[in-house]
Amino acid sequence: MSDNHTHTETPENCTHDCSTCGEACAQHEPESLQQPLRPGSRVDKVIAVVSGKGGVGKSLVTSLLACEMQRRGHQAAVLDADITGPSIPQAFGVHGGAMGGEDFLYANRTRTGIEIMSINLLLPNETDPVVWRGPVIAGAVTQFWTDVQWENVNYMFVDMPPGTGDVPLTVFQSLPVAGVVVVTSPQELVGMIVDKAVNMADLMHVPVLGIVENMAYYTCPDCGKQHAIFGESHIEAIAAKHGIPNTAKLPIDPAIAAACDAGKIEDVQGAWLSSLADAIEGK
């Protein structure tokens, strides 16, 4: 009995179009699960922002990276894939409903022109809960990619839900993710959780461009001394362990929190993520 999984020699008349071929040859490539953009949309690079657990500031980092790239003259966009806990519209002060036609939506724009799409822009009330099962949530994220008109986007940042469940898997498989940014906090336990996020990126063959440690320190307004409120940093050790080239630290700053609450994240100025943005530009 023959083994259907045994690779044969490449046929002489091979067209290299594996989608039309039933041969199990050595050159056969698995079918891609990536989904196309709708006609007329353009997204040059997709960067996923992930975390192993919630509450570490992933949406903040996503927003700040989008703002940084927009300031550098690129067209930035944010796809809010955190369907059950969306916070991107609040950070940017965007509250109007998304507009569109029968089978598509336009991305909303922030004050500085960043394109965003989030489930909160589609709900009758922003406080309505999204009580959906995993496959439905993952399907909604895919539709944000395929059914939204993205206008000449240079860098799209995907704000992922925490963990390694349905949505992260869907994003890695359905979108052409060029790189990952991992967000963490100083607690030592989080180092183990970060390992899971990094290992998932490795499993999906997507490079980790950098790690951002949020709430890394507090700077005393009187003496200027930095205090590690939540413990000493482990970010360099984690980065070295996984061979990740870039690290960044965000401070505990009431002004940043106030800007997010007021929908004015675009007014926050700081060079904390400059080196990471350089790496993203070079990707």
Segments (PLM) and residue ranges:
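Phosphate-binding/switch loop-helix module in NTP-utilizing enzymes
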Residues: 123-171
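C-terminal lobe/tail of nucleotide-utilizing enzymes
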Residues: 2-31, 198-283
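Residue-level signature of catalytic and energy-coupling elements of molecular machines
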Residues: 43, 54, 80, 88, ...
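Glycine-rich phosphate-binding loops of nucleotide-dependent enzymes
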Residues: 117, 160, 173, 209, ...
